[in-house]
Amino acid sequence: MLKIYNTLSGKKEIFKPIEEGKVGMYVCGNTVYDFCHIGHARAMISFDVISRFIRHLGYELNYVRNITDVDDKIIKRAEENNESTQSLTERMIAAQREDELRLGNKMPDREPKATEFMQEIIDMVQVLIDKGFAYQGTSGDVYYRATKFKDYGKLNNRKLEDMLAGARIDVEVAKEHPADFVLWKQAKAGEVSWSSPWGEGRPGWHIECSAMSTNCLGSHFDIHGGGPDLKFPHHENEIAQSEAATGKEYVNYWMHCGAVRVNNEKMSKSLGNFFTVRDVLAKFNPEVVRYLMVSSQYRSAIDYSDQSLLEAKVALERLYTALRQQQVAESFEPTVFTERFEEAMKDDFNTAVAVSVLFELVRELNKAKTEDANKASLLAAELRSLAELLGLLYQDPEYFLQNSTVSEGLGEVAIQALIDERTQARKDKNFARSDEIRDELASQGIELLDSREGTTWTRS
């Protein structure tokens, strides 16, 4: 029984699809004016894992993730680069796909671009005007009447006035109310634009997603996801637009992944702690980055640092070491490990617990290597199968172990984790694994000193 934390209700709910056996999921994608940063990677990997597990449960999933390819930021960046908006967005879309493939993601079933749905956007704006939910201001821009939608604020469980108090709202004389937001912008000279009943212009950000999602998945669909910063105003505005236009409930389950913090601070260019995926992959194996992202439950915040990636590298090496020179059966009968892994994933896609199950499986696998070769090969197959649902352990073990190193040494947390594992291995009389860990630490310049009180270490 799959349970999903629904932002709309603020609690975990049993998942019940609108149509039995089928799931429609829309995730807000990137505005393609720059390279993907690690916050984008967190969202993309989270929903990739979610989509994998939904399919694993036997559902026919239609996973749609949009591309925002018309926006003020795109226009500004194209001007700075002295290139067309189309040239810029095509370059950034290609770069994003390259980054995702390196991170081990599978592509969504459909990636609609805003520029491909211009007529559908215009049609939805017109419906909102006809129903009295939108109006053309004195500036010529078209705005949504936020006060007319009685459920405005339901996603964030706040009243309109409260949300305005804590939000950055553009004060424009052309608007009837400070909370009203733009649906269609009048074009400025030289900007990319489209013809509409309200003159040459382009759509606002929020209406793009309403039009694309409802055209790709229908006016009422199962899951809508995105990053933590999209709850307000973007997703709140999507609900207001879509439900006003269609007269139906828009989405059943709203999912938001956690933020990525850098050295326990918010990631921002002004703080100088902003990292693109490409920055990170220049130093770390892509699978190490992926492991860091899935080692926490998708709603939890992740603290990104070189140290956290080094610890992720050590953990992933432990998994790959278990598969090194290990026969892998072609098929296997699921054991208690599969049961516990699935139980964790059914509990709001708890990848943190699922990953811990992989390490329990590895301990059993290492023990079986010296006791029962056939059992070891079956457990290795089960490990590969479960890890694939997280997008892990897809490389050849020897290749990964030879290519996962970075210039920095192991941090204290990573060293202690290995020492703790070695202590447990010795208690279990798994001396082969104990020796492996000692050798692994020695290769990193770490010397272990065993005594009655325990194990200490020094750097050689």
From Swiss-Prot:
Entry-linked SMART domains: DALR_2
EC number: 6.1.1.16
UniProt keyword annotation of Ribosomal protein present: no
Compartments, as annotated in UniProt: Cytoplasm
Motif 'HIGH' region per record, residues: 30-40
Cofactor: binding comment: Binds 1 zinc ion per subunit.
InterPro entries membership: Cys-tRNA-ligase, Cys-tRNA-synt_Ia_DALR, Cys-tRNA/MSH_ligase, CysS_C, Rossmann-like_a/b/a_fold, tRNA-synt_1_cat_dom, tRNAsynth_Ia_anticodon-bd
Catalysed reaction equations from the record: tRNA(Cys) + L-cysteine + ATP = L-cysteinyl-tRNA(Cys) + AMP + diphosphate
Organism superkingdom: Bacteria
A GO molecular-function annotation: cysteine-tRNA ligase activity
Motif ('KMSKS' region): 266-270
A cellular component term, taken from the record's GO annotations: cytosol
Binding site for ATP: K269
Gene Ontology biological process terms from the UniProt entry: cysteinyl-tRNA aminoacylation
Keyword entries, A-Z: Aminoacyl-tRNA synthetase, ATP-binding, Cytoplasm, Ligase, Metal-binding, Nucleotide-binding, Protein biosynthesis, Zinc
Membership in a protein family: Belongs to the class-I aminoacyl-tRNA synthetase family.
This protein's name: Cysteine--tRNA ligase
Species per Swiss-Prot/TrEMBL record: Marinomonas sp. (strain MWYL1)
